[in-house]
């Protein structure tokens, strides 16, 4: 009976702490996760900027082709930040008369109205169409009077945005039904007999007027087109080019916020120009690569600074978050048996383990004294060569806190 006491095991057993292990961690996964998150954000933002740059160079400021008729005036106003120069090339270099005007550091060229009338008599064969281009600026007004012969016949008068296919290679051409029944047409009219169509232009753009005959007989169409067009004043220009070699370039002013504009014009009717004359040009923009490089550098620097400050805030915020445990840490290090310290420890045990969120906090790390986990999780951190998850100091011992 006297030997029973010697066989009893103590209620609480403290495993001997391994004191010679190096410190590397369960919580290195936190640093790895933060690093991956930073790299992901960095990659996403740089990828978005690359996508935006491609859209600017090949989309907004990509090359475009435009059909021009007589009395046309095109205003081009790209950003001098991203565009170094404007190049206009005449693709059908057979008719003189085009002009390129440049404006540096001046206000937008003022507009004025020009009136002219076109009379066209079209003989449209069966299952065919005829058409011609216009470039019309916002505010232009058109009155189209028509007369269809023989009586009782009907044709479709379709006006589409953008250049049409007349004069293009066969593989670019639309079929008759595509033109006559185009759902995206800006204006679509089935006309017969006599009448008039009124059109108000709300967008500066190239337009193509097409007369399509789907009948199995030839039809004659008489059109009187009265145009009140908006053209741009080019009297105060700082640059002028007459396309003597088939192309012209206008260099943008690099000083910001100086505004730069270019205006391409075609000759008016009556200057050796008929209503059937057309010009086919290509507008292209030379990108200012130094601007894209500068924006990339600024964005890269901003991202690196942001990541640096986030790392500092994360580190400082982590320690400050549990700064209230400093009294517990100081008390435990100063006097293990002090009653006030035990009371503080009892209060801290009301919080759950910051790692497993299951057991109460019943241990502290030495020498720093932080109390943020249960004893089981703290022992795992120590045995896996960890550091204190709060201050990242090397852990020498995990001290278990006993409560009544």
From Swiss-Prot:
Coiled coil: none
Organ and tissue specificity: Expressed in the shoot apical meristems (SAM), root tips, pollen and inflorescences.
Top EC class for this record: transferase
GO molecular function: transferase activity; zinc ion binding
Cellular compartment(s): Endomembrane system; Vacuole membrane
Top-rank taxon: Eukaryota
UniProt key word Transmembrane helix: yes
Gene3D superfamilies: Zinc/RING finger domain, C3HC4 (zinc finger) (3.30.40.10)
GO biological process terms, semicolon-separated: mitotic cell cycle; pollen development; protein ubiquitination
Observed phenotype of the null mutant: Plants lacking APD1, APD2, APD3 and APD4 are defective for cell division in male gametogenesis resulting in severe abnormal bicellular-like pollen phenotypes.
Pathway, per record: Protein modification; protein ubiquitination
Catalyzed reactions per annotation: S-ubiquitinyl-[E2 ubiquitin-conjugating enzyme]-L-cysteine + [acceptor protein]-L-lysine = [E2 ubiquitin-conjugating enzyme]-L-cysteine + N(6)-ubiquitinyl-[acceptor protein]-L-lysine
GO cellular component: endosome; plant-type vacuole membrane
SUPFAM superfamilies: RING/U-box
Chief place where the protein resides: membrane
Record field: transmembrane: 42-62, 289-309
EC number: 2.3.2.27
Biological role stated in the UniProt entry: Involved in pollen mitosis II (PMII) regulation during male gametogenesis.
The protein's name: E3 ubiquitin-protein ligase APD3
Naturally occurring in which organism (per UniProt): Arabidopsis thaliana
């Amino acid at each position: 009976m006297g030997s029973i006491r010697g066989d009893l095991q103590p209620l609480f057993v403290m495993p001997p702490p391994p004191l010679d292990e190096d410190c590397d961690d369960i919580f290195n996964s936190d640093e790895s996760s933060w690093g991956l998150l930073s790299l992901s954000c960095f990659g996403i933002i740089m990828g978005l900027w690359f996508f935006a740059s491609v859209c600017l160079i090949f989309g907004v400021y990509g090359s475009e082709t435009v059909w021009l008729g007589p009395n046309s005036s095109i205003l081009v106003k790209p950003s001098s930040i991203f565009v170094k120069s404007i190049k206009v090339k005449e693709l059908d270099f057979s008719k003189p008369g085009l002009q390129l005007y440049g404006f540096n550091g001046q206000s937008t060229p003022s507009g004025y109205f020009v009136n002219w009338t076109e009379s066209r008599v079209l003989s449209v064969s069966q299952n065919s169409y005829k058409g011609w281009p216009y470039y019309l600026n916002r505010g232009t007004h058109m009155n189209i009077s028509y007369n269809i012969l023989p009586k009782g016949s009907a044709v479709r008068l379709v006006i589409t945005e953008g250049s049409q296919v007349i004069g293009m290679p066969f593989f670019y051409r639309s079929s008759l039904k595509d033109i006559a029944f185009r759902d995206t047409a800006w204006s679509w009219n089935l006309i017969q007999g006599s009448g008039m169509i009124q059109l108000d232009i709300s967008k500066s753009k190239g337009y193509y007027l097409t007369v399509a005959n789907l009948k199995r007989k030839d039809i004659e169409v008489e059109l009187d087109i009265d145009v009140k067009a908006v053209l741009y004043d080019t009297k105060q220009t700082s640059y002028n080019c007459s396309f003597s070699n088939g192309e012209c370039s206008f260099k943008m002013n690099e000083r910001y916020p100086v505004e730069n504009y270019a205006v391409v014009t075609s000759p008016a009717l009556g200057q050796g120009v008929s209503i059937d004359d057309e010009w086919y040009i290509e507008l292209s923009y030379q990108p200012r690569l130094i601007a894209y490089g500068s924006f990339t550098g600024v964005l890269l620097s901003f991202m690196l600074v942001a990541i640096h400050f986030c790392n500092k805030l994360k580190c400082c915020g982590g320690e400050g978050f549990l700064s209230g445990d400093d009294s517990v840490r100081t008390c435990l290090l100063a006097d293990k048996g002090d009653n006030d310290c035990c009371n503080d420890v009892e209060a801290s045990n009301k919080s759950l383990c910051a790692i497993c969120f299951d057991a109460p906090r019943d241990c502290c790390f030495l020498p720093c004294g932080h109390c943020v986990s249960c004893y089981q999780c703290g022992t795992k951190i120590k045995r896996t060569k960890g550091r204190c998850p709060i201050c990242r100091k090397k852990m020498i011992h995990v001290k278990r806190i006993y409560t009544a």
